[in-house]
Amino acid sequence: MNKAIINDEIVIAYDVLKKSEIVENGKIKKTWRGQISTFGAAVTMGSLIPAVAFFSDQGGSSVKRQCIMDAILEILKRDHIAPEKYHTLFEYVREQGEHCREDVLNAAIVLKLAMNLYTLEKE
């Protein structure tokens, strides 16, 4: 985790969340925080590409997990880390490989931190 990057990206993450499907009427379901935490753990304990592939599908989740992947990619694009040519986070990590792991984790961390700026609600 790079604190300087986190500080720079928190404003970006707040704006990305505001424009995403994750925020509804200025509120975020607590389920989203759980999903982003699980994603971070999957990347840290496992491998980046399989974690992104898994979270790109809704599976049995009550929320559309692809929104998290979209938000992470948008943060990376706005911070000029990921080029605009990528349409999905999976495309980006597939091409960049494991060396973009820290950038993806930083974006996930800042996304979770920015969620604290919204009202959290139970399902």
PLM feature spans:
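The feature represents the first ordered module of a protein
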Residues: 2-89
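Amphipathic alpha-helical binding modules
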Residues: 87-123
